[in-house]
């Protein structure tokens, strides 16, 4: 059957709307050859122009539109459509002002409300966003949604809702932004892989700004592949630019390469504005190398960096395009590079606008800190920047979000810590160690109301985890989708309130007033200058240098495998070999990290705070801490607020499947609590709901179950119960959490370190939710050791001994040296 030109045009539009651009191109080419009516020829030309623009041929696209506008006999509606198409072409070429002009002409010429007019409102809103005119952008989106609803087009209305989320992102409301985008994705995702990729690119920006760069970059790389396969060069290049911006924070060398690829692609597309943006990111990436990050890694320095003339010219070009935020970030990055390399010429800092993006404001504070004449001035500048970051992040109650937002403060933390170390003053170093630890602890979560939808999604995730390979289950498309929905739901539902007692930092003298003669605080501080420890007692404080840090750092990567092997291989000829290897490694770590420190204090009780670079160290197994009582706090300030004596009257126990001596372990432990008739759940009774219900009724919760730490998404770490895995996300659903939690499980004492100080995992999730103390191990623990040691520990807990004292006493009585350690306010 031979299709008419009108039918081919209709089919071409259907293909375009579904993202099938190759099929659309063929249908429209045939339609153009058969069209006689000038109005139809013009409409076909307009749609072909859209495809040409997507194919990277903006000149051809513009010519198609202007030639069509010159035809006699075209309708007002077609004229409006062509003006709208010219606006979209201008938008893709990086000319938002021209786009607004053409789109306004198209909107004014459109005779009545329709889907086409709504699409022009949608595109004009994007142009307003690029110009920073967010109120105008929001107004256009509201008009677009009204037109789409009148036209009964929910799919297009979802696109508008998604863009409302992008406006919230630009306004700094990450939670609201992700909420709109996830809601829109439910409708958009079914359209095509192109629609899904378009939405994913914007969601990746939200995740990047939230510090979740791994997830953001995974989405962007997938989108780049989709756009490349569909020959959508503009969208592909924009996604590469976004990927480079994300990599800039942690992999500047790769960021420079990706930005260069985007720059080349934009040059081919003749998009001057977009090319300048990519060139700016590439220049910043080249200037960002050669620093020590918060994990102790030295980022490689670029062989060649842009000189002052290149930076000045590029910044001026960005200014000319109205991208003053990009220009300012580039200028500040260049000044910072010059200061760090001893080439500062005293160029005054550019004047910031009140509306400057947070990234630019924080960069300015970092430059002021680097240029400061004295360490005191440097600390003051860095502190002001961190206070501004804290004000922005204050409303976020989610642990997932709080810990990741610390990304934005990394440079300022490094500057402040380095300045504090330069003084050699224990009080200054302690203050900045607390600033680093408290950056993600300024607020605590309000307990959310019951959420059946979140519960349903977590239940489906439990089923998927049971069915899929343990090491890759979150890569499954459905699991990944559910994980994103759970994250959005949890971000939105967990509000924040001030931390107890206002969340104030305790200073060194304030901490010392809380220490008795037999208690000391060890605050390990990592900075670009290395590792040091502030040792504080009731009447004295000093800074201890740890010159062996570099050697200790090389011992950490093999530590976990030694610990896991030692717990798994308990007999046979290899057991002694493995044990000797582990003992040697632990002795070396103790000598390098603790011997210089413990030589300064005879205190039996030690409050220990550590940076993320020391995550995973089994402190309780290090020889220099034998015979001492230790508690490992998120921060000394939080310990100070929660150190009041515990009153533990009731206990509950749960055993997961396939734990060899699990029932024996909890039965032995529960015998210490017989006067209160402790609840014990095992077998089919040890369910998610059963344990969750028990949690609210006990002071001490002890779970003996197999556990697994999920590094890519630590809040999907969990404990295996009878009907699935209890995730970290489940903890925020609990109306009340116990005072003390004992996790006798493989790995769940581990944490994934995000951006330096703040670790996240099951242990941190319980503490964040309100538990005073968590007893857990960062590695595999032999079932025999867990059974005997924890049973003895419960005797102390039931007798009123503090958790840290109870664990230390149990270790001494049983002679078992295991990696269990006390987190939080253990004494």
Report the location of each language-model feature.
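Structural signature of alpha-solenoid helical repeat junctions
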Residues: 3, 40, 78, 116, ...
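An often Trp-containing, charged/polar helix-loop segment at the C-terminal end
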Residues: 786-827
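Cysteine protease catalytic core and zymogen-processing segment of caspase-like enzymes
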Residues: 623-639, 671, 708-772, 826
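Amphipathic alpha-helical segments of tetratricopeptide repeats
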Residues: 29-33, 66-71, 104-111, 142-153, ...
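Catalytic-core domains of enzymes
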Residues: 544-547, 551-562, 581, 601, ...
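Amphipathic alpha-helical protein-protein interaction segments
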Residues: 301, 308-312, 323, 343-350, ...
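Residue register of alpha-helical TPR repeats
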Residues: 6, 43, 81-83, 119-121, ...
């Amino acid at each position: 059957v031979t299709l008419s030109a009108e039918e081919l045009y209709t089919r071409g539009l259907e293909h375009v709307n579904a993202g099938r651009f190759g099929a659309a191109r063929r249908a429209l080419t045939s339609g153009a050859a058969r069209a006689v009516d000038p109005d139809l020829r013009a409409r076909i030309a307009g749609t072909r122009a859209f495809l040409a623009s997507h194919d990277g041929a903006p000149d051809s696209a513009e010519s198609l539109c202007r030639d069509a506008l010159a035809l006699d006999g075209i309708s007002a509606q077609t004229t409006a459509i062509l003006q709208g198409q010219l606006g979209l072409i201008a938008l893709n070429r990086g000319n938002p002002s021209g786009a607004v002009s053409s789109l306004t002409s198209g909107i004014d010429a459109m005779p009545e409300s329709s889907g086409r007019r709504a699409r022009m409102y949608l595109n004009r809103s994007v142009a307003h966003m690029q110009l920073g005119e967010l109120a105008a952008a929001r107004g256009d989106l509201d008009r677009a949604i009204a037109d789409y609803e009148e036209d009964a087009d929910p799919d297009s209305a979802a696109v508008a809702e998604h863009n409302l989320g992008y406006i919230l992102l630009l306004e700094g409301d990450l939670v609201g932004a992700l909420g709109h985008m996830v809601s829109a994705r439910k409708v958009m995702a079914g359209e095509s892989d192109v629609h899904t990729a378009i939405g994913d690119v914007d969601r990746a920006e939200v995740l990047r700004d939230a510090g979740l760069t791994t997830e953001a970059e995974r989405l962007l790389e997938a989108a780049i592949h989709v756009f490349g396969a569909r020959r959508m060069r503009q969208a592909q290049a924009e996604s590469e630019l976004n990927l480079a911006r994300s990599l800039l924070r942690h992999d500047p060398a790769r960021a420079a390469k990706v930005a260069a690829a985007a720059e080349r692609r934009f040059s081919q597309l003749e998009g001057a504005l977009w090319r300048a943006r990519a060139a700016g990111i590439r220049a910043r990436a080249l200037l960002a190398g050669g620093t020590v990050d918060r994990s102790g890694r030295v980022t490689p320095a670029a062989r060649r960096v842009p000189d002052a003339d290149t930076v000045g010219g590029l910044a001026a070009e960005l200014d000319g395009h109205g991208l003053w935020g990009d220009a300012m970030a580039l200028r500040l990055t260049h000044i910072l590079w010059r200061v760090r390399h001893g080439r500062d010429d005293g160029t005054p800092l550019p004047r910031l606008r009140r509306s400057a993006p947070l990234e630019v404001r924080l960069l300015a504070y970092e430059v002021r800190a680097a240029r400061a004449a004295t360490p005191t001035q440097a600390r003051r500048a860095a502190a002001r920047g961190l206070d501004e970051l804290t004000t922005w992040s204050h409303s976020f109650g989610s642990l997932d979000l709080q810990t990741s937002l610390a990304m934005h403060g990394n440079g300022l933390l490094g500057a402040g810590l380095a300045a504090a170390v330069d003084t050699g003053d224990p009080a200054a170093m302690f203050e900045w160690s607390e600033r680093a630890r408290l950056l993600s602890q300024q607020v605590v979560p309000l307990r959310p109301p019951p959420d059946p939808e979140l519960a349903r999604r977590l239940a489906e995730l439990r089923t998927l985890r049971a069915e899929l390979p343990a090491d890759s289950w979150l890569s499954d498309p459905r699991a990944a989708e559910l994980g994103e929905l759970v994250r959005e739901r949890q971000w939105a539902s967990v509000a924040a309130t001030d931390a107890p007692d206002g969340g104030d930092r305790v200073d060194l003298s304030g901490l010392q007033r809380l220490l008795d003669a037999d208690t000391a605080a060890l605050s390990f501080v990592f900075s670009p200058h290395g590792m040091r420890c502030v040792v504080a007692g009731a009447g004295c404080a000093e800074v201890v240098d740890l010159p062996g840090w570099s050697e200790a750092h090389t011992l950490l990567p093999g530590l976990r495998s030694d610990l896991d092997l030692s717990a798994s291989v308990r007999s046979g000829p290899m057991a002694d070999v493995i044990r000797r290897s582990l003992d040697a490694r632990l002795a070396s770590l103790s000598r390098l990290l603790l011997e210089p420190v413990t030589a300064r204090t005879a205190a039996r009780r030690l409050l220990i705070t550590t940076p993320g670079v020391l995550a995973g160290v089994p402190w309780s197994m290090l020889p220099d801490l034998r015979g001492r009582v230790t508690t490992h706090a998120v921060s000394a300030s939080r310990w100070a607020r929660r150190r009041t004596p515990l009153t533990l009257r009731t206990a509950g126990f749960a055993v997961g499947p396939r734990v060899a001596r699990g029932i024996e372990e909890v039965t032995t432990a529960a015998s210490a609590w017989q006067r209160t008739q402790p609840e014990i759940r095992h077998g089919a009774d040890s369910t998610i709901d059963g344990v969750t219900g028990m949690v609210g009724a006990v002071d001490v919760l002890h779970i003996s179950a197999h556990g697994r730490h999920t590094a890519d998404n630590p809040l999907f770490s969990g404990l295996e119960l009878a009907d699935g895995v209890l995730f970290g996300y489940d903890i925020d659903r609990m109306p009340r959490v116990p005072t003390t939690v004992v996790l006798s499980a493989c790995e769940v004492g581990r944490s994934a370190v995000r951006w330096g100080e703040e670790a996240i995992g099951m242990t941190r999730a319980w503490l964040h939710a309100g538990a005073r103390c968590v007893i857990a191990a960062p590695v595999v623990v032999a079932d025999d050791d867990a059974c005997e040691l924890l049973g003895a520990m419960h005797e102390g807990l039931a007798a009123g001994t503090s958790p840290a004292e109870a664990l230390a006493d149990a270790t001494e009585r049983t002679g078992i040296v295991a990696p269990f350690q006390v987190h939080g306010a253990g004494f």
